[in-house]
Amino acid sequence: MKKKLLFLGPPGAGKGTQANLFCKKYGLIHLSTGDLLRDEVSSGSVLGIKAAEIMNKGELVSDELVLSIVEGRLANINEGWLLDGFPRNVNQANSLKNLLEKINQPLEGVILIKVADDYLIKRLVERGRQDDNEQVITNRLKIYREKTSPLIDLYKKQGILEEIEGNADIDVVFSCIEKSLG
């Protein structure tokens, strides 16, 4: 079983849910940049306030900020890990690759969870987070298509991408992920 993983997919695809299940079952450390950023916002720090302003508009937090958060976490992990919500663009992917080479922890697998837009919007609106209103969601999906979708080709070319249909029940999606990482 691969132990250094990345889950990709649009907002609301179920990356966090699947990552939590996978990490719990296989003892990996779950690194969710969304959770790390929300924790920073909740702390009320200057950085958290700045991040909240960006996130509430549905925009992406700067590469430098997210990379420094991820680097701080990865530096303290010797066992397996699963990244969820990072990288979000080719620049971040290249920075992540350099970081992982530096700490001798190369990425072993990437799971792309694919979900139809209408299903995503419904799922996100029902989730009820402050940054989950329809206008913000539509903007987040647009940014995902523009910035994050190119990662699919990047990881395909590296031979480490597995695509999973995410419209099914949680258990079905989880089973598909397990089989693909076998």
Curated annotation (Swiss-Prot):
Q: Which GO terms describe its molecular function?
A: adenylate kinase activity; ATP binding
Question: Residues that bind AMP, according to the entry?
Answer: 33, 38, 59-61, 85-88, 92, 129, 140
Entry keyword ATP-binding: yes
Q: Which InterPro entries match?
A: Adenylat/UMP-CMP_kin (IPR000850), Adenylat_kinase_CS (IPR033690), P-loop_NTPase (IPR027417)
| EC assignment | 2.7.4.3
Catalysed reactions, as listed in the record: AMP + ATP = 2 ADP
Pathway assignment reads: Purine metabolism; AMP biosynthesis via salvage pathway; AMP from ADP: step 1/1
The UniProt comment on domains reads:
Consists of three domains, a large central CORE domain and two small peripheral domains, NMPbind and LID, which undergo movements during catalysis. The LID domain closes over the site of phosphoryl transfer upon ATP binding. Assembling and dissambling the active center during each catalytic cycle provides an effective means to prevent ATP hydrolysis.
Against PANTHER family, the record matches this protein to:
NUCLEOTIDE KINASE
Q: What is this protein called?
A: Adenylate kinase
